[in-house]
Amino acid sequence: MIIVCASCGAKNRVPEEKLAVHPNCGQCHQALLPLEPIELNEQNFSNFISNSDLPVLIDLWAEWCGPCKMMAPHFAQVAKQNPYVVFAKIDTEANPRLSAAFNVRSIPTLVLMNKTTEVARISGALRTLELQQWLDQQLQQQQGN
């Protein structure tokens, strides 16, 4: 399994059975499975998304968005509970090309990616339990496919 380091962008080959021991990057020695959302931008998005074998849940948000700010701690809480999903945030104001590529119509918008394929999307602020239930449902559907 390939895991892209959120800190330095290096690709790391990690056997699936080693994921439970919280592996570190071979290049920068940072945790490969951070238990908090990472920041993606127009510079690191393509490398990260196309090379990560883990599902990536992206929160498309903006600084001025009240519901986005309300949802942020819930998104971070669910990230702590799901080490085998990468939680990422993209600031739509700072990254307008990514916002356009995702065809964002309202924020916050959550997009679940499997490599470069969008597998699910939901718009609107979610609380911890709602977000966890939605994510579980999407991951179960992916396992069934």
UniProtKB/Swiss-Prot annotation:
The lineage of its organism: Bacteria, Bacillati, Actinomycetota, Actinomycetes, Mycobacteriales. Residues 29-140 form the Thioredoxin domain. SUPFAM superfamilies: Thioredoxin-like. Participates in various redox reactions through the reversible oxidation of its active center dithiol to a disulfide and catalyzes dithiol-disulfide exchange reactions. It comes from Corynebacterium nephridii. This is Thioredoxin C-3. Keywords: Disulfide bond, Electron transport, Heme, Iron, Metal-binding, Redox-active center, Transport. It comes from the Bacteria. Pfam families: Thioredoxin (PF00085), Zn_ribbon_Thio2 (PF21352). InterPro entries: Thio2_N (IPR049299), Thioredoxin (IPR005746), Thioredoxin-like_sf (IPR036249), Thioredoxin_CS (IPR017937), Thioredoxin_domain (IPR013766). Disulfide bonds join 65-68. GO terms for cellular component: cytosol. Coiled coil: none annotated. NCBIfam families: PRK10996.1, thioredoxin. Heme binds at residues 25, 28-29. The keyword Transmembrane does not apply.
